[in-house]
Amino acid sequence: MAKRVAAIVKLQVPAGKATPAPPVGPALGQHGVNIMAFVKEYNERTAAQAGLIIPVEITVYEDRSFTFVTKTPPAAVLLKKAAGLETASGEPNKKKVAKLPRSKVKEIAELKMPDLNAASIEAAMRMIEGTARSMGIDIVEG
């Protein structure tokens, strides 16, 4: 017989730097999960992606055990890293903060493809370009 799911918790945590402090502790503590076990396993799995924020979906079962799935980093985080930005533009329509070649957008789209609701790489690229536009990043040919 399969375990019964008690809750699904979604968090965005820096790779390799999860701690029992907020937001991880309170989110898992209220479901009775062993927080240190999650933190240790998450940090081991994401150590190679240091510096990125990794979304994680934690499934908590009624017997207080858990499983989790890590997703790809948010498009905005990948775009900021590719453009070398600390923060995006506060006024994306007026103030452009960077230019990014279409080849970089394609790389990001290929990385994000498993988590995007897109049928083709071109559709995924359009989604990433839309995110870039809303951040004040211009997409240039190249």
From Swiss-Prot:
Record's protein name: Large ribosomal subunit protein uL11
GO molecular function, one term: large ribosomal subunit rRNA binding
Stored Gene3D superfamilies: Ribosomal protein L11, C-terminal domain, Ribosomal protein L11/L12, N-terminal domain
Family: Belongs to the universal ribosomal protein uL11 family.
Function: Forms part of the ribosomal stalk which helps the ribosome interact with GTP-bound translation factors.
UniProt keyword annotation of Ribonucleoprotein present: yes
Lineage: Bacteria, Bacillati, Bacillota, Clostridia, Eubacteriales
Subunit composition and interactions: Part of the ribosomal stalk of the 50S ribosomal subunit. Interacts with L10 and the large rRNA to form the base of the stalk. L10 forms an elongated spine to which L12 dimers bind in a sequential fashion forming a multimeric L10(L12)X complex.
GO biological process: translation
Keywords linked to the UniProt accession: Methylation, Ribonucleoprotein, Ribosomal protein, RNA-binding, rRNA-binding
InterPro entries named in the record: Ribosomal_uL11, Ribosomal_uL11_bac-typ, Ribosomal_uL11_C, Ribosomal_uL11_C_sf, Ribosomal_uL11_CS, Ribosomal_uL11_N, Ribosomal_uL11_N_sf
GO cellular component: cytosolic large ribosomal subunit
PTM comment: One or more lysine residues are methylated.
